[in-house]
Amino acid sequence: MADTLERVTKIIVDRLGVDEADVKLEASFKEDLGADSLDVVELVMELEDEFDMEISDEDAEKIATVGDAVNYIQNQQ
């Protein structure tokens, strides 16, 4: 899980320009990290590329926090 979290954190920091310390499992992309809808779509696309997977639109809508993203990726691998 640590490797997945590190990779997800790097993508979030690069995409949203937030401090790495703010990227916690419970952090919401929109409320806590300041992402808008387009940012979230782009994050999902980057996660798909990074982890060589496809995330359906239905599943993407359920990914609201950093922890949601990490858990989803872990469960798909």
From Swiss-Prot:
Q: Which InterPro entries match?
A: ACP, ACP-like_sf, PP-bd_ACP, Ppantetheine_attach_site
Metabolic or biological pathway: Lipid metabolism; fatty acid biosynthesis
Principal location class? cytoplasm
Modification comment: 4'-phosphopantetheine is transferred from CoA to a specific serine of apo-ACP by AcpS. This modification is essential for activity because fatty acids are bound in thioester linkage to the sulfhydryl of the prosthetic group.
Q: Where in the cell is it found?
A: Cytoplasm
Q: Which GO terms describe its cellular component?
A: cytosol; membrane
Recorded hits in Gene3D superfamilies, A to Z, give: ACP-like
Q: Which intervals hold domain Carrier?
A: 2-77
One of the GO BP terms on file: lipid A biosynthetic process
What keywords are annotated for this sequence in UniProt? Answer: Cytoplasm, Fatty acid biosynthesis, Fatty acid metabolism, Lipid biosynthesis, Lipid metabolism, Phosphopantetheine, Phosphoprotein
- Positions of post-translational O-(pantetheine 4'-phosphoryl)serine modification: S37
A single Pfam family it belongs to is: PP-binding
Which GO-annotated molecular functions does the record name? Answer: acyl binding; acyl carrier activity
Q: Family per UniProt?
A: Belongs to the acyl carrier protein (ACP) family.
Report the protein's function.
Answer: Carrier of the growing fatty acid chain in fatty acid biosynthesis.
PANTHER family recorded for this chain?
ACYL CARRIER PROTEIN, CARRIER DOMAIN-CONTAINING PROTEIN
Q: HAMAP family, alphabetically?
A: Acyl_carrier (MF_01217)
> This chain belongs to which protein, by name?
Acyl carrier protein
The source organism is Bacillus subtilis (strain 168)
> What gene is this protein a product of?
acpA
